[in-house]
Amino acid sequence: MKDQGSSGVSPAPGEGEKKAINSELWHACAGPLVSLPPVGSLVVYFPQGHSEQVAASMHKELDNIPGYPSLPSKLICKLLSLTLHADSETDEVYVQMTLQPVNKYDRDAMLASELGLKQNKQPAEFFCKTLTASDTSTHGGFSVPRRAAEKIFPPLDFTMQPPAQELIAKDLHDISWKFRHIYRGQPKRHLLTTGWSVFVSTKRLLAGDSVLFIRDEKSQLLLGIRRATRPQPALSSSVLSSDSMHIGILAAAAHAAANSSPFTIFYNPRASPSEFVIPLAKYNKALYTQVSLGMRFRMLFETEDSGVRRYMGTITGIGDLDPVRWKNSHWRNLQVGWDESTASERRTRVSIWEIEPVATPFYICPPPFFRPKLPKQPGMPDDENEVESAFKRAMPWLADDFALKDVQSALFPGLSLVQWMAMQQNPQMLTAASQTVQSPYLNSNALAMQDVMGSSNEDPTKRLNTQAQNMVLPNLQVGSKVDHPVMSQHQQQPHQLSQQQQVQPSQQSSVVLQQHQAQLLQQNAIHLQQQQEHLQRQQSQPAQQLKAASSLHSVEQHKLKEQTSGGQVASQAQMLNQIFPPSSSQLQQLGLPKSPTHRQGLTGLPIAGSLQQPTLTQTSQVQQAAEYQQALLQSQQQQQQLQLQQLSQPEVQLQLLQKIQQQNMLSQLNPQHQSQLIQQLSQKSQEILQQQILQHQFGGSDSIGQLKQSPSQQAPLNHMTGSLTPQQLVRSHSALAESGDPSSSTAPSTSRISPINSLSRANQGSRNLTDMVATPQIDNLLQEIQSKPDNRIKNDIQSKETVPIHNRHPVSDQLDASSATSFCLDESPREGFSFPPVCLDNNVQVDPRDNFLIAENVDALMPDALLSRGMASGKGMCTLTSGQRDHRDVENELSSAAFSSQSFGVPDMSFKPGCSSDVAVTDAGMPSQGLWNNQTQRMRTFTKVQKRGSVGRSIDITRYRDYDELRHDLACMFGIQGQLEDPYRMDWKLVYVDHENDILLVGDDPWEEFVGCVKSIKILSAAEVQQMSLDGDLGGVPPQTQACSASDDANAWRG
């Protein structure tokens, strides 16, 4: 070997008797995957890999490599010296290393090992070419690729004919070689002619060998060669046996390990299958990688042009390569399989530090009823990982938490995820559960279905008010429960009971809450039937009789006040009269006069003092009235059954799903709200108990039932029934019936307001809410509502101007004192708006297994998103100011807005397109045109188009038929005619942002899917496209949403 020298990695090559080998040229000849550790760093030496190098050089099988018993499978050493070598005859590169085993190592050596991983010793400018037969012929020359010649060689003088120049390059041994570089031929090409034949003959190059030209850091032109691997004859055993070489190498390493003495090894990167001296930092990093069977990985391999390529593979086994001689060794402990069939030549066992594990996402195979991927839905935020996004896309009811807790399902409340999946596997369990869920809600949702299906002519924002009060008003019904208890009698006991129940766990609270909820829903349905029948009866009575009865009743009331003493029975009777005022017909039967102040209720009954016992005639009249009420109840039940039969099964299922989802949203309250609900229930139970005590004091339930079920409870409604539409009446009763859910509010029962008085106030216009409730309580409620600035709700004072009666809402004047939601709906700015039907088909289907409703988009039925639309300023209501339009446009705009419901006291729920709970449908099943057909203003369906340097434009994407029309129109708008239509022009790129905020190229998707998914369009220049490819975004320009759509945090709805 000649021209041998040594040079450290850090210092520059030293000058001495012999020239040092250029490090960049050495690494270029060694290969792109070779990286030597720096001197002074810590390395891991594997004797097993060293033996493989010897076996490869001797052309011997690996199974015949002998072992050494006292030598461990690896040694942690310190690299003392490193010398680069090149064979003088073959130019084969190798390195000599001096290692010293260490038991302890300092921090500096560890840092040097880590820094060695970041050093790149490969040359920046080089090219490598495998020689062909013509390149190695004596009469020809070396053909150089054009780009390589222009990059590496000095520029030619093209004024000469032909252009030519002389090149001087040095090899590994610092020998200079001269070549003539000429540009000639047809077609013209770069050739090395003079001097090339001498170089090929001197180096004994053959076809298949490779030649490298590089420019080092000093811009010197260097030349190197790589010889192809060819079978060589094995050395004669008389010269040197392979076993003796193996034993000598292993013995030297074992001696050094026992005595901590230095030993020398030689590493040939072109002959050795793998590196057997690994930086300690690289080894430690690989050990932290958790590998498992089936894991995907990448591995780098060298290409013919001295480049690198990654091949994909799968781990098929983990274990020792040679468990007998090298036990518990990490050398090639992974058995792998390669994806490509051309990779069959590659070895089937690799080491853990040679691979790059691929963290594949966790895919879920959803059941068939889950929604499909297209059309694309707005997803979860960009900062979520792929596992959470997969869960939320496949299982929409999981919301933001998919832990193993009892998640409230949107289809079956109270079922956990495991139970729901088990029911899907067992159709019998699913059928039984569906029947169990349907039964307690059918009665309470009968009129609610009319509210959705039959009231298509009313303003959708009024329906929002009704639904919101249904969710939050606690047990607000006519004549069903005691709405205003006597606080002097019942304050202490509910307070003690609430203290005891607050200590109970949250699980017991939820169970009690569900039980009371089911009971009160059934009771509300019964009372609703009674009140409807009373309302129909009262419509036939003239208004004059009501006035006369009210005046006579007022006179009798004044007389009863003077006769009644202040005892407990009198106070209870006064409470009952305030809650259940008797009708005018009952006053006539009892012989009592009437007065105009009938609506204020009696303050006393002839049951205290001298009037404690009713007369026989009055008792018989009371019994007759009770029988009459029982007959009315039976007829109303029959009428309701006929109404349920007339309703179609899809309508029943749609309304049932909406009600269950509302209850599911309210059941996700935090424990503090649940404790408040328990306190509410305790107060309600005390009220029921006091009512039962009053029934015993009256001597039976007949008289109480007569007073309770009196038709006069609907007397204040008579002035409104003449002008209200039937749909509005049904809606008001639906609000009263559904408001009995105890889980919908945490307000104390004393703050509830009777719906009769609210309806009366809507008609009178001069009465205040303080007529029935103490003024300090109302002041506290208003302070609580106004003290929450985060609700994003506009607290407006209702206008005192005269409003047409068809625009009034019966229950709009009630104040909600719920601490779970704490908002006051403002309906006055939105009275004239109508909402178009959304997704009336292909979104709700019936499961054929049990005829239970299964929806493709469960989240879309939640009214929370539509409530959010009504909460901000009037500027955000532009999406509600039109009649009907194409369903695809409505879906585009709805899905572009992700509403946050934190201000409503429930977890975040994103509003997704697909189906809306506020669809206006007529009895025939067709979309309704709305009540105000004279409004011609349409919703904005336009999509924003932006181009940097130009004013943004808006286009109606639905009026185009294909991509060609869209490109042509956009090019004309922005003055770039002919540059968008030509696919070969690179000046401008047309991209769009979909609902997942992904930036895609216009034209890849089918036109129909593009129209349904486009959110905004941008025209990017070539520089912007390049910047986007580097940064992964639009160069700092945030993607614009659709016109008049809400942003992710609903700030766009603010004025």
UniProtKB/Swiss-Prot annotation:
PB1 domain span: 940-1024
Cross-referenced InterPro entries: ARF_dom (IPR010525), ARF_plant (IPR044835), AUX/IAA_dom (IPR033389), B3_DNA-bd (IPR003340), DNA-bd_pseudobarrel_sf (IPR015300), PB1-like (IPR053793)
Location of the protein in the cell: Nucleus
UniProt region (Disordered), positions on chain: 485-510, 532-565, 585-609, 701-720, 732-769, 1034-1055
Keywords (A to Z) from UniProt: Auxin signaling pathway, DNA-binding, Nucleus, Transcription, Transcription regulation
A Pfam family matched in the record: AUX_IAA
DNA-binding region ranges: 127-229
CDD domains with a match to the protein in the record: B3_DNA
Domain notes: Interactions between auxin response factors (ARFs) and Aux/IAA proteins occur through their C-terminal dimerization domains III and IV.
Protein name in UniProt: Auxin response factor 16
Native species: Oryza sativa subsp. indica (Rice)
